Regions:
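A solvent-exposed, acidic/Ser-Thr-rich amphipathic alpha-helical stretch
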Residues: 62-137
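Bacterial N-terminal signal peptides
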Residues: 10-22
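Short, low-complexity N-terminal intrinsically disordered segments enriched in polar/charged residues
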Residues: 27-72
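Active-site micro-motifs of SAM-dependent methyltransferase domains
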Residues: 54, 76, 176
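N-terminal secretory signal peptides that target proteins for export/translocation
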Residues: 1-9
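Short, low-complexity disordered leader/linker segments with a strong preference
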Residues: 2, 19-31
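A structural signal for alpha-helical segments
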Residues: 37-40, 83-86, 150
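A beta-strand edge to alpha-helix "cap/lid" segment located at domain peripheries
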Residues: 27-36, 110-190
């Protein structure tokens, strides 16, 4: 009889424990899992990075080609704590366009070349929002001409959040990471 009571109590405790655990897991929000990226996703995101450099360096379409690489609410951060550009108009201006009218590109000549952007060593990984990435930023010399000490060679990098839209992959957030920090070390500001 004592053994039967002990078994009954053990079973009740086990059932009660399972009910509590089940209720707790049902109430806990499910963490969004990152969907795997396809080979085409990786190609498309790499093309986004390539288009970024060309749109920024050429100020094409008065900077709006650059701005359109972002989501409508996309943000470019100039380092943590630095200024930020939000939305299409501010992003076009960040590329030198918009109200600024691409003056840097118009003034460029052999003696005053435009420093071009090279995004290299891109690492792209799935994330619950779409994908995250980090890469280095390099400014090569132009026609054998160097700019100045702050605009040649490795000048930091980027840390990105990409989302897939009906227009393809776009930047949701991009931070220009300045040395000595390494891309991937920042937490996106809100």
């Amino acid at each position: 009889m004592i053994a039967a009571v002990q078994i009954s109590l053990t079973l009740r405790t086990l059932v009660l424990g399972l009910m509590v655990a089940s209720a707790a897991s049902a109430q806990a929000p499910a963490a969004r899992k990152a969907a795997p990226l396809t080979a085409q996703d990786y190609i498309d995101i790499q093309q986004l990075l390539n288009r970024y450099a060309f749109a920024l360096d050429t100020c094409s379409n008065n900077g709006y080609d650059y701005a359109d690489l972002y989501t409508p609410d996309g943000i470019f951060y100039w380092g943590i704590g630095g200024r930020k550009s939000v939305g299409r108009e501010q992003l076009a201006e960040a590329a030198g366009g918009g109200k600024q009218g691409c003056q840097r590109q118009k003034a460029a000549n052999r003696e005053n070349p435009i420093q071009t952007h090279m995004t290299v060593n891109a690492i792209i990984e799935p994330s619950p929002e779409g994908a995250i990435g980090r890469s280095y930023l390099v400014y090569p010399g132009v026609q054998g001409i160097s700019g100045d000490g702050t605009h040649n060679g490795h000048v930091g990098g980027y840390q990105d959040l990409y989302v897939k839209t009906d227009k393809g992959w776009r930047f949701k957030r991009r931070i220009h990471v300045f040395p000595p920090d390494i891309p991937g070390s920042y937490v996106f500001p809100e």
